[in-house]
């Protein structure tokens, strides 16, 4: 998946990421850009507009939770399937989340990282992160196979 050099680059960069801010924005953007994903979050209250979603405290809190899990995965890049096994089971068996949504969230996360980190988020770093988010999405979808 990733070379040792790529792992060093993504983990080094990840230390600069403000997980609470990036997580909140990434989940919020997912819900706005792909509104059908909102069906999993109806209990979060008002999701009636982009502003409502982006300012929703429950969306922000869950976005941080999602990125906390992603951060854990960043510590275990060689065992993403093992790291995300329980979350894969939860999302497959109990929540019935379409695994395609994991790919969508990964792509939104890359957009948010680029927005927050500007020129520091180079095309090469983006390519490396695309590998990471694809690996995480694959690990989360593992239970579906």
Curated annotation (Swiss-Prot):
| Positions of heme b binding | 62, 91
Task: Alphabetically list the UniProt keywords.
Answer: Heme, Iron, Metal-binding, Oxygen transport, Transport
Query: Is the keyword Transmembrane helix assigned to this protein?
Result: no
Which GO molecular function annotation, any one, does this entry have?
haptoglobin binding
Among SUPFAM superfamilies, the record links this protein to:
Globin-like (SSF46458)
Membership in a protein family = Belongs to the globin family.
As for what it does, the entry says: Involved in oxygen transport from the lung to the various peripheral tissues.
Protein name per its UniProtKB record: Hemoglobin subunit beta-A
User: What organism, scientifically named, is this protein from?
Assistant: Capra hircus
């Amino acid at each position: 998946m990733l070379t040792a050099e790529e792992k060093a680059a993504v983990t080094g960069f990840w230390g600069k990421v403000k997980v609470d801010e990036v997580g909140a924005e990434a989940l919020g953007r997912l819900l706005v850009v792909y509104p059908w994903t909102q069906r999993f979050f109806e209990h979060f209250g008002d999701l009636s507009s982009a502003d409502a979603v982006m300012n929703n405290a429950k969306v922000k809190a869950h976005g941080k939770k999602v990125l906390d899990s992603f951060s854990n995965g960043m510590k275990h890049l060689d065992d993403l399937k093992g790291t995300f096994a329980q979350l894969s089971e939860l999302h497959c068996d109990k929540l019935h989340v379409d695994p395609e949504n994991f790919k969508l969230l990964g792509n939104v996360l890359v957009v948010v990282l680029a927005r927050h980190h500007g020129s520091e988020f180079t095309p090469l770093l983006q390519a490396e992160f695309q590998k990471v988010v694809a690996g995480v999405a694959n690990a989360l979808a593992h239970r579906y196979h």
